[in-house]
Amino acid sequence: MKVKFENPHGAIAEEIEARFETFVEGVNEKVAKYYAEKFPTLDPEHVVVSPSGRTYWKLIKEKKENPETGQRFVYGFVRKADGAIFKAASWNAPFTKGPTAIRGYVTDESNGMDAARVHGIIYAV
């Protein structure tokens, strides 16, 4: 049986995708500001979206200058159906267990930025 997910704010797919793009831009701004203030001599990191994935957008954090030589890790996941934001359980999957699995929505008033931290999606709600 396939489960249907609905956005609690009544957003449609096009709006979710647009808000997701804004969310990624906001995360990158937050990370860039952190690196500029705390580590101005280091290569900055940024968050990119993995091109594959039927159910989730995977956000990957990597070095901006040389992504192929630097370390990469999963920043978090966003479900395409409803814009729900999840922390990463592993490289391949989000943490979806329990009532507190969803950390926020990209359609929230904050555009999901309340769930975003410099190093990844907020761990505890």
Model-based region annotation:
Residues 43-76:
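Exposed beta-strand-loop-beta-strand "reactive/processing" segments of non-cytosolic proteins
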Residues 82-112:
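A short, surface-exposed interaction/processing loop segment used at functional sites
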Residues 13-16, 27-28, 32, 49-50, ...:
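Short linear sequence motifs
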Residues 10-11, 37, 44, 58, ...:
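Accessory DNA-engaging acidic/polar modules
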Residues 5-42:
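Short, non-transmembrane alpha-helical segments in secretory-pathway proteins
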Residues 78-80:
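Short, acidic, Ser/Thr-enriched surface-loop or helix-capping motifs
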